[in-house]
Amino acid sequence: MPGLLVAGTTSDAGKSTLTAGLCRAFARRGVRVAPFKAQNMSNNSMVCQGPGGAGVEIGRAQWVQALAANATPEAAMNPVLLKPGSDHRSHVVLMGRSWGELASSNWFEGRQVLAETAHRAFDDLAARYDVVVAEGAGSPAEINLRAGDYVNMGLACHAELPTIVVGDIDRGGVFAAFFGTIALLSAEDQALVAGFVVNKFRGDLDLLAPGLRDLEGVTGRQVFGTLPWHADLWLDSEDALDLTGRRAASTGAHRVAVVRLPRISNFTDVDALGLEPDLDVVFASDPRGLGDADLIVVPGTRATIADLAWLRARGLDRALMAHVAAGKPLLGICGGFQMLGRVIRDPDGVEGPVAEADGLGLLDVETTFGAEKVLRLPRGQGLGVTASGYEIHHGRITAGDAAQQFLGGARDGQVFGTMWHGSLEGDALREAFLRETLGLTGSGTSFSAARERRLDLLGDLVERHLDVDALLALARHGCAPALPFLPPGAP
C-alpha cells in the first residue's frame, strides 16, 4: 500500500510535527495525502463531522495534520483514541464514537477489536488517497508491547509500510537511540526501516555530518535530513508532555494563568490567547502561580471530580475565590466550568467512583454526568458577536435563575463558564472577551491565519532540510531490498 510510517526513538521525538510537515510537503506536490494514527493516547481531541452530520472525535494532532494535508478530517484518520481518566484506566473512542473503558489489566483482551478496527481504517484511507502518512506512538522498540502492537511495526507489517525513525537530538544520545531502536527489532521489522530524520538540531551542521555518515555506515540506512530547532514551530499538541514549554513568547502587560490540572484536556483552548501581544500566558499548579494573574482559566479535564478534589487539596480553590473577590475575571471551560458550579453529580460512575461533589459555588449551575457523550459543533452568539466551538462532554448542565447564558454555559459578573472548546480561536469572540474582561482593544490577530503560517513554515523547513523527493518515492515504492540486519534483534 502507498504510505509511510513515521516512528520515533521516544515519545515527543517529533513524530506529530514531522507527519504534519510531510503532509504539507506532499500536498504541495499535488499528492492526495492523508494522515493516520492507529491509536492515540491523549486528552486533547477535536470534533469533526461524521456520517450524516453527526459529530465524531479524533486526536487534535490528526486534525491539524489533516489541515496540513488539505484533507477533510475524519474518524478513519485516528480510529482508536484513548483518553486517560486515571493512571490505570482509559476511555476508548472507536472510529470517533464512545466505545467504553479499558483498564491496563485487561488491555490485551480488548486489543484485538481495536487492532482490527485500526487496520480497516488504514486500508480504507489507502484506497481513497495517493499516500497515507502514518504516525507511530512512543517507540517501535518497546519489546514488551510488540506482540500486541498495531500502531508501530505491527501496522507497518500489516500494510508493508516503509518506516523512518525520527530522533530528538536536543535531548542528547540520538545516535545510540537510532542504532538501539533498530537493533531491538526483529529481522522482519528491520527490513521495513528505511532510515532516519534528525530533529531539533541547533548549531553547525558540518559538525554533525561525520556522525550522520557513520550512522549510515553502521546501519546501512539513509539519513533523510536534519530538521533545525525552531522556536515558533509549535502546533496543536496531542499530550501534556510539552506543557512546560507552552508559554507565550510575549511579555505582555496582562498575565493569564491557566490551572494545570492533573487530567487536563484540550489545553489548546488557550493557544489563541498565547498569540495576543498584550498577554503573557503561563500554566500554574499552586496558589502562588495564580496570585498576580489578571485572568485565570480553569481548563477542561477528563476527571472533573477528581481534579476538583486535587484543586482543593492544593489550596487553589481559595486562590480562585480571592481572585473573584478582587473583581478579576475567571473563565472555566467544560470540566473547569463544571467545577465553578454548585454541585457535580456522577450517579453512574462515568468519570470515577465519587457519585457527587460540591462545586465552588461561583456559578448558579448544576452538572449531572450521563452515559452518552455529547459531540457537537455549536454556533451562536456570545458577547454580541458570532461564536463557534466544539463540545466533548458527558455533563448535562442545569442553570439556575442567577445564571446568565454564555456559550452553552453561564456567566455571573466576571465569572464565565462555557461548554464550548475552541471558542477563543474565533477572532471576534476572543476580541470581545478580552475587551469585556481586561479592557483590551483588538490586536487584529487571526488565529486561523497564524496556524496556517506555522503549517507553511513547517512545510518550508521540511522542503529545505529533508530529501522530500526520496521520501515520496519511498512512500510510493517501498524500501530497498536486502537492508542489513543489525544484531541482536528482538529478544
UniProtKB/Swiss-Prot annotation:
Keyword entries, A-Z: Cobalamin biosynthesis, Glutamine amidotransferase
Claim: Repressor is one of the keywords in the record: no
Pathway: Cofactor biosynthesis; adenosylcobalamin biosynthesis
A Pfam family the protein falls into: GATase_3
NCBIfam families, per database record: cobQ, PRK00784.1
Listed InterPro entries: Class_I_gatase-like, CobQ/CobB/MinD/ParA_Nub-bd_dom, CobQ_GATase1, CobQ_N, CobQ_synth, GATase_3, P-loop_NTPase
Domain called GATase cobBQ-type: residue spans: 253-429
Transmembrane feature ranges: none
Similarity comment: family membership: Belongs to the CobB/CobQ family. CobQ subfamily.
GO BP: cobalamin biosynthetic process
Active site: C334 (nucleophile), H421
General function of this protein: Catalyzes amidations at positions B, D, E, and G on adenosylcobyrinic A,C-diamide. NH(2) groups are provided by glutamine, and one molecule of ATP is hydrogenolyzed for each amidation.
Name the UniProt record assigns to this protein: Cobyric acid synthase
The keyword S-adenosyl-L-methionine is annotated on this UniProt entry: no
GO MF term (any one): ABC-type vitamin B12 transporter activity
